[in-house]
């Protein structure tokens, strides 16, 4: 399959461990693809929940997916600053239909003031029992929480203000076309 190019629009689908569709984002604009990563942007993007509810994203958000890390990162660009929502999730796959990954419930939220919070621990424990997450997945996810916190603390990749500035500026240029 050919990789999507800069300016292409793709669909993103998140699933649960049991294979059920969790959430879909329509028309994410691709900013960059490499062999292992995809950077995109959602701006007033239609999101459909598994129960059929629909909503539209409120602000531009740079999205980062990687094929080797068990997380993805959403950098929400607001007037008050950039805040982050990080999903602990399987590395993504890309097929002709969509970019797809498994959402493993745990999330890390980083507020514009730098405060960090680990979210949905109870939901993770509940789903781990219900869906029989294997021990190795549990270990990998917990190790990737550590990697993610390290990236946050070191302002690495998407957590760097220059990264956000570069990709947001590129999005604004592409949007004018």
UniProtKB/Swiss-Prot annotation:
Binding site for Mg(2+) 1: 87, 103, 107
Broadest EC class assigned to this enzyme: hydrolase
Reactions it catalyzes: a ribonucleoside 5'-triphosphate + H2O = a ribonucleoside 5'-diphosphate + phosphate + H(+); a ribonucleoside 5'-diphosphate + H2O = a ribonucleoside 5'-phosphate + phosphate + H(+)
Source species, domain of life: Bacteria
GO molecular function, one term: ribonucleoside triphosphate phosphatase activity
Active site positions: 23
Enzyme Commission number(s) from the entry: 3.6.1.15, 3.6.1.6
Record keyword Metal-binding present: yes
Cofactor(s) needed by this chain: Mg(2+)
Bridged cysteine pairs (disulfide): none
Database matches in NCBIfam families: PRK13662.1
Function: Has nucleoside phosphatase activity towards nucleoside triphosphates and nucleoside diphosphates.
Protein name: Nucleoside triphosphate/diphosphate phosphatase
């Amino acid at each position: 399959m050919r990789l999507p190019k800069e300016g292409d629009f793709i669909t993103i689908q998140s699933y649960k461990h049991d294979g059920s569709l969790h959430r879909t984002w329509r028309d994410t604009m691709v900013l960059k693809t490499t062999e292992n990563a995809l950077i995109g942007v959602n701006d007033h993007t239609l999101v459909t929940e598994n129960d059929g509810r629909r909503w539209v994203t409120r602000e531009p958000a740079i999205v980062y997916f990687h094929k080797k890390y068990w997380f993805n990162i959403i950098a929400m660009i607001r007037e008050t600053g950039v805040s982050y929502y990080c999903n602990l999730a399987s590395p993504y796959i890309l097929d002709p239909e969509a970019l797809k990954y498994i959402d493993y419930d745990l999330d890390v939220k980083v507020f514009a003031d730098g405060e960090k919070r680990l979210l949905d621990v109870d939901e993770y424990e509940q789903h781990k029992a219900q869906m029989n997450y294997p021990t190795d997945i549990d270990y990998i996810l917990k190790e990737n929480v550590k990697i993610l916190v390290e990236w946050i603390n070191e302002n690495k990749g998407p957590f760097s203000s220059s990264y956000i500035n570069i990709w947001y500026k590129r999005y604004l240029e592409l949007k004018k076309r």
